[in-house]
Amino acid sequence: MASGSSSDAAEPAGPAGRAASAPEAAQAEEDRVKRRRLQCLGFALVGGCDPTMVPSVLRENDWQTQKALSAYFELPENDQGWPRQPPTSFKSEAYVDLTNEDANDTTILEASPSGTPLEDSSTISFITWNIDGLDGCNLPERARGVCSCLALYSPDVVFLQEVIPPYCAYLKKRAASYTIITGNEEGYFTAILLKKGRVKFKSQEIIPFPNTKMMRNLLCVNVSLGGNEFCLMTSHLESTREHSAERIRQLKTVLGKMQEAPDSTTVIFAGDTNLRDQEVIKCGGLPDNVFDAWEFLGKPKHCQYTWDTKANNNLRIPAAYKHRFDRIFFRAEEGHLIPQSLDLVGLEKLDCGRFPSDHWGLLCTLNVVL
């Protein structure tokens, strides 16, 4: 203990100290078990292998998913210990490939030889989406559904939440026209995808939320787009009504970080905030120079609710709830960034009878005024 009396320092060794630490130890062990179960599920989905065999290969590779996947796929073909399908179990006849293998496919931007943008830098587009990687049901088909949206809209930037390691590995393989920056490497996390040849990555920073119970943080990425400097941010703020106080603390951290960027830098935050409107009011509202894109556009009804259990039955919740959990905040020099449109994506059911996620994604287009 850094400070305090000797009696304070000795307290944890007594019965009261042991009793106080027991719940924390139990919670830590429960979290560890949950993370490893999640790793096993994701590994089995990607590897197309018997789930009962997964823990052993992960243990042999220190529970490092990427290392374990590499070791697994490099096993000799005559090794009968791991009956498996071809390396990517996501693949099917209806598979949507984001690697732009078809030379005639113009939906994915390829980097230009000169390194200059291939499109008008006065307009930028992005998608923010909680892709619900924690739901293992129909995950391969749902991942293809998300990728088909990326191929269709070809956004400059993609903000993702609830990404798991196998999903990230899949994106790195299939979304080869994007640079992927993640907020973590284990459990579940956020990610920001930057279109190569269009968005130049400069640096990244991860801001921890010290009191989170759900592995949440703030991912910040500094980029250059069309000669303009941007600070891109995403987060998945604490979930559920019971964690409102922590969510408000996290929102204050986000807004504070948005104010730290130089005045000449445009700041965009997009993510799953889990916010209720009254929580923004409790936080003191948005700063005068930070705007909510949906409110800026006149609060259009067609894209108000991004989590709607009546329209989206992925969670099979009998009651009907709808919230504007997914939000976009921006800070720019006056008049230099103007939202033009905001739409929901991922609205079509897949062949499996489910949507790509329990959240709708948000597609936003903005004009950059020099």
Swiss-Prot record:
Chain sites annotated for binding Mg(2+): 132, 162
Co-factor binding details: Binds 1 magnesium or manganese ion per subunit.
Start-end of Low complexity biased regions: 9-26
PTM summary: Ubiquitinated by TRAF6.
Molecular function in Gene Ontology: 5'-tyrosyl-DNA phosphodiesterase activity; endonuclease activity; magnesium ion binding; manganese ion binding; phosphoric diester hydrolase activity; single-stranded DNA binding; tyrosyl-RNA phosphodiesterase activity
Membrane-spanning parts: none
Lineage: Eukaryota, Metazoa, Chordata, Craniata, Vertebrata
Broad class of where this protein is predominantly found: nucleus
GO CC annotations on file: aggresome; cytoplasm; nucleolus; PML body
Disordered as annotated region, ranges: 1-32
Active site: 272
Biological role: DNA repair enzyme that can remove a variety of covalent adducts from DNA through hydrolysis of a 5'-phosphodiester bond, giving rise to DNA with a free 5' phosphate. Catalyzes the hydrolysis of dead-end complexes between DNA and the topoisomerase 2 (TOP2) active site tyrosine residue. The 5'-tyrosyl DNA phosphodiesterase activity can enable the repair of TOP2-induced DNA double-strand breaks/DSBs without the need for nuclease activity, creating a 'clean' DSB with 5'-phosphate termini that are ready for ligation.
Interaction with 5' end of substrate DNA: annotated segments: 130-134, 236-241, 274-276, 315-321
More about this protein: Can partially complement the absence of Tdp1 due to its weak 3'-tyrosyl DNA phosphodiesterase activity.
GO biological process: double-strand break repair; neuron development
Cross-link Glycyl lysine isopeptide (Lys-Gly) (interchain with G-Cter in SUMO2), sequence positions: 34
Residues modified as N-acetylmethionine: 1
Site (Interaction with 5' end of substrate DNA): 188, 307, 325, 359
UniProt keyword annotations, A-Z: Acetylation, Cytoplasm, DNA damage, DNA repair, Hydrolase, Isopeptide bond, Magnesium, Metal-binding, Nuclease, Nucleus, Phosphoprotein, Ubl conjugation
Residues annotated with Phosphothreonine modification: 99
Cofactor(s) needed for function: Mg(2+); Mn(2+)
Subcellular location: Nucleus; Nucleus, PML body; Nucleus, Nucleolus; Cytoplasm
Name this polypeptide is given: Tyrosyl-DNA phosphodiesterase 2
Residue pairs linked by disulfide bridges in the UniProt entry: none
Protein family (similarity comment): Belongs to the CCR4/nocturin family.
